[in-house]
């Protein structure tokens, strides 16, 4: 086997199933490897930003990495905005980038650039492969790093891809054990039972079904309010799921909301800050007079951490459906008249099917949607944790490939759509739902 085949076989043995790619000359051995090594299906994208956005959507819905295959530094540059979103959302991505042959780099050919430095801006882990002897181990290490909820970048020179391997052992990723800090759970239980007004701010995996179920039980026990980050990578919403109040985008409204609380417990989200530096407003949305407690757990352990908090509080094992916010589906009436942004939000909330995946990049047009959809049938919503627009249509591609049995609805702002229109070609080519 050559290096490309070793890489693909290692990834397939680790459970990876898809690769989103816009390859070039330096990636041809890997392209050929998809034909000779079974297990990973390649999906062609016409633009690298669509490939990286699709990998983000796929990873958010499966909790395992898709592979991206990008062409040299400029290909990485074209895809970097949606890798930024993936990084901010804690999405697992195996980001493979082709590089010039090792002996050709000194020629300073037109496409030569400092890939490693650029990759470092979005990668939680990265490595440049220098020999086929370590390529399987390098790939396994990258996958293990990605599974921790980050972009793991592997830079592979073309001669490492095409060279035959003297060592054909296939290595497995070594997955690190999950961690939950018990002291932080005990501290959270203490402050939640104070007689002061308290909020539990949820983010990341705390917004999955298990996390929200535990948060609902904590709310019933302690009387705290449930808040959520503004643009979560993934959140479960709808009837029967504990509802959260979204921290507003604009600083004045966000400060008004958060200043109501003397005690703040944070689970799975960094302390909230303003999106930009707004004149006359602080960057921090919390203040020094508030008592702030952070639940310390790795990304995947947050639901378990909240369940541990339930046990520490001796919260109820079950709560009534009415305690989640809505016990019955309530749909708005279909509006009449012109199709406005507000009416589009109403129509979507009125018609979206049960178990839909809503990829929400509606930006300013979708302000009415969130409060309307909280009483819709249970659904998953994905938003824009990194703020880099142009994610919606590619993310919908990845979500549809990840969950072909579920309808995917992309609520898309027209301006943001212009960045990654090529995703429509991918949706049509693959016949996605």
Model regions: which residues?
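Short glycine-rich anion-binding loops that position phosphate/pyrophosphate groups of nucleotides
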Residues: 25-26, 71-75, 99-100, 158-160, ...
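A cross-family phosphate/adenosyl-ligand binding-site feature
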Residues: 1-54, 160-187, 217-234, 239-263, ...
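Structural signature of the thiamine diphosphate
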Residues: 17-18, 60-97, 120-169, 188-198, ...
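Active-site diphosphate/adenylate-binding microenvironment
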Residues: 4-8, 12-17, 22-26, 30-35, ...
């Amino acid at each position: 086997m050559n290096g490309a085949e070793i890489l693909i076989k290692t990834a397939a043995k680790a459970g990876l199933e898809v690769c989103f790619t816009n390859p070039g000359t330096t990636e041809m051995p890997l392209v050929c490897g998809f034909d000779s090594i079974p297990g990973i299906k390649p999906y062609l994208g016409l633009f690298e930003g669509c490939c990286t956005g699709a990998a983000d959507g796929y990873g958010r819905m499966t909790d395992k990495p898709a592979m991206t295959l990008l062409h040299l530094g400029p290909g990485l540059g074209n895809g970097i905005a949606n890798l930024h979103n993936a990084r901010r959302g804690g999405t697992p991505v195996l980001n493979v980038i082709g590089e010039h042959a090792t002996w050709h780099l000194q020629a300073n050919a037109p496409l030569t650039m400092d890939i490693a430095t650029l990759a470092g801006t979005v990668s939680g882990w990265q490595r440049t492969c220098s020999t086929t002897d370590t390529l399987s181990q390098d790939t396994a290490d990258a996958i293990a790093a990605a599974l921790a909820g980050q972009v793991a970048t592997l830079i592979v020179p073309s001669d490492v891809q095409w060279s035959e391997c003297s060592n054909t052992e296939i290595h497995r990723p070594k997955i690190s054990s999950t961690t939950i800090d018990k002291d932080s759970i005990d501290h959270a239980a203490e402050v939640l039972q104070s007689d002061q007004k308290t909020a539990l701010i949820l983010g990341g995996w705390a917004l999955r079904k298990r996390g929200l179920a535990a948060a609902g039980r904590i709310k019933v026990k302690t009387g705290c309010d449930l808040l959520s980050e503004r643009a979560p990578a993934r959140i479960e919403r709808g009837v029967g799921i504990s509802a959260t109040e979204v921290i507003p985008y604009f600083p004045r409204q966000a400060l008004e909301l958060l200043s109501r609380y003397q005690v703040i417990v944070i689970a799975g989200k960094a302390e909230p800050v303003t999106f930009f530096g707004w004149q006359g407003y602080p960057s921090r949305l919390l203040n020094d007079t508030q008592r702030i407690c952070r639940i310390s757990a790795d990304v995947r352990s947050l639901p378990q951490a909240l369940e541990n908090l339930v046990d520490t509080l001796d919260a109820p094992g079950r709560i009534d459906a009415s305690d989640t916010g809505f016990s019955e589906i309530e749909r708005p009436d279909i509006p009449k008249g012109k199709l406005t942004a507000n009416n589009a939000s109403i129509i979507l909330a009125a018609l979206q099917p049960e178990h839909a995946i809503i990829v929400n990049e509606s930006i300013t047009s979708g302000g009415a949607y969130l409060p309307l959809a909280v009483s819709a049938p249970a659904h998953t919503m994905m938003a824009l944790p990194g703020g880099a627009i142009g994610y919606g249509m590619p993310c919908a591609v990845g979500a549809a490939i990840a969950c072909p049995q579920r309808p995917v609805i992309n609520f898309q702002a027209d301006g943001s759509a212009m960045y990654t229109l090529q995703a429509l070609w991918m949706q049509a080519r693959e016949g996605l739902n």
